[in-house]
Each structure stands twice: as C-alpha cells, then as structure tokens.
Amino acid sequence: GIIYNQSIMDKYFKLDGAKVKSMDEINSFTKLKEVAEDMQSKKDELGIKGVFASTSLTPGEDWRWQTHLANLPIYYEYKDNNVKDEDKISFKYSDNYKNIFDLYINNSTCEPKLLGSKTVADSLSEFALGQCAMVQNGNWGWSQIAGVSGNTVKEDDVKFLPIYTGVKGEEKQGLCIGTENYFCINKEA
C-alpha cells in the first residue's frame, strides 16, 4: 500500500484550502491526486521536499514497480475475466498503472531524471527523515524506517492507504496483501 505519515497529513489538514480534512476522505485516485498535487504545491509550508518518496529505479531496486505495483492491473484484469491464471496478460489497466506511477514521479522528493539513481533505502530514508508524506511499500517497511539514523517518524504515525489507480469501484478497495506470484515470459527471447 501507500505508507503515510499521519503527522504530516495532520499538518496538511490544518492548512487553509486543504482539499480534505482527514484521510477518510481519500478513497479514490481522483481524490488522492487532488490532495497530492495540492500538498506538492504547499511542500514548503509542510516542511517536506515532496509528497512521495523518490521512486527507486536503480537496477535491482525497481521491484516495487515491476512486481508489487503491477499486481493491481493484473488483479483487475483477472477479476474482469473471472480467472485465477492467464496465459497472456493484455494489460487492460495500463492507464491505471500509469496514473499512480506518474503521480509518484511528478510529486516526488526529487526530479524525475534522478530516479534511475535512487534505491529503496533512499526512499525509506526520505520518509523516515520527514522529507515526504508518503511512500509505497509494505508492512515490513517499519523496521527499515525505524532503523534510519535520525528517524523522525513515530511508529504511531505510520499508517496505510490503498493504492488507488482510477479503477471503477475502487472506493471499496482495501489494502493489497501478499506478494506477486506470476511469471512473465517473452516468447521472442
């Protein structure tokens, strides 16, 4: 899911013109995007470098995007087809994947051109040091966050939000659980 820092969010809720007054109001991609873009425009007031931690695209560090985030469009495609397995994935929900990925990149702690040099440790450090309000990761992330030297995030302020992508009916979506369990094979390789 999306881990968020409740303390930073509470600070945002108190700002004049905040798009929401509580996390309970964020139940769709449309609302998440509205809030993230508003927070990014007010990052100086919030004392953050960006809403989302840097997207770790260093080779070997990109598993959050190639697997964990990819679970969502695959899940919805399987759900539509009422199957548990497919020989071929059409990536019908690629635009939804792009929605959230672009939101992460465009409202980040760093410029998009630097993301190829960022690691998971970098993104979790940014979160731990209070430089961002949100980071995509799992419930195992707390041990990494807590282990960062200079960590400013209290354990009670670490909360989770579903990863919204703009799929119809997502307001009823919960948190993703488990990890990926699929293989993609290029028949041309």
Ranges and model annotations:
Residues 26-31, 114-129:
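Short helix-initiation/N-cap motifs at beta->coil->alpha
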Residues 120, 137-142, 179-181:
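Beta->alpha turn/N-cap motifs
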